[in-house]
Amino acid sequence: MRRRLLVAVLVALASAVRAQQEVPEPREYRMDNYRAPVPAALSGARVITTEDAETIWRDKQGVFIDVLPRPPKPQNLPEGTVWRDKPRFNIPGSLWLPDTGYGKLAAASEDYFRQGLARASGGNSAVLLVIYCQENCWMSWNAAKRAMSYGYTNVAWFPEGTEGWERALLPMEESQPAPRPGDGKASPQ
């Protein structure tokens, strides 16, 4: 009798802990605390695992979009200071559209994201877009939700991102952000 009671209590406690860890899917974009546990779902999108992402990547079934932010060069650096951007290693062949996963985007960032998705998809709103960042990063959740709001109908959200990819010992490559309009740099893709 005591053993059954103990088992029942332990099961109830485990269920309570799991319930606390589950993050509900919000209706709106996440506006702050972007590095935090994410929900298990995104309405309208397919949520994929690292195994799913690897299959899509190997079979060239979709376009991979990395939305990890990139810190800007500080404006107040002393003259002569050499600035080196931190390298970004992501899934080979990805288009890196930094700073496009914030909850609210400036008009220029929104245009940059729209243009990047249009270029990546070849203007086809049914092309599979695999959107990712890092694990426990709301940037990818926001960006995938935003892509659907633009009319993209085949969006996959990869919440494990580059950390899940790297844990699976899959190849990574150093990447540069897609150029923003007017920055004068050649497009990486």
Give residue ranges: language-model regions.
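Bacterial N-terminal signal peptides that target proteins for export
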Residues: M1-L6
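Bacterial N-terminal signal peptides
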Residues: V7-A14
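Short hydrophobic beta-strand that contains or immediately precedes a catalytic carboxylate
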Residues: A53, V63-L68
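Rhodanese-like catalytic fold shared by cysteine-dependent sulfurtransferases
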Residues: V17-E51, I56-D59, Q75-V130, E135-Q189
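Surface-exposed acidic loop/strand-edge motifs in secreted or periplasmic proteins
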Residues: V67-P71, N76
